[in-house]
Swiss-Prot record:
Tissues in which the protein is found: Expressed in the anterior region of the follicle cells.
Annotated signal sequence range: 1-19
GO biological process, one term: oocyte development
Species in which this protein is naturally found: Aedes aegypti (Yellowfever mosquito)
Subcellular compartments: Secreted
Name of the featured protein: Vitelline membrane protein 15a-2
Length: 97
């Protein structure tokens, strides 16, 4: 009888040691850190540069201006009057040695 009780105790101990315990809970997930957004670059506010230089000239020489005509000088709205009397150049200033 003692052998049966000893066997029962041993059997209970072995079964207790082999019990299927529940697995430990998984660790909490790591907090998600999103990568920083790319730096903001405003779109350009001008037209892209042309691949070749832009030339704003006529392919031929402009005709001579007539006496008393008004000429548009440059792209700005400024007008130059063509004199009817030739302008004589001023003599050079005297050289100071």
């Amino acid at each position: 009888m003692n052998k049966i009780i000893a066997a029962l105790v041993l059997f209970t101990a072995v079964i207790g040691a082999l019990a299927d315990y529940p697995a430990p809970p998984p660790p909490p997930p790591k907090p998600y850190h999103a990568p920083p957004p790319p730096p903001y670059h405003a779109p350009p506010h001008h037209a892209p540069a042309p691949l070749h230089p832009v030339v704003h000239t006529y392919p031929v020489k402009a005709p001579a201006a007539k006496c008393g005509a008004n000429l548009l000088v440059g792209c700005a709205p400024s007008v130059a009057h063509v004199p009817c009397v030739p302008v004589h150049p001023h003599p050079p200033p005297p050289a100071h040695y």
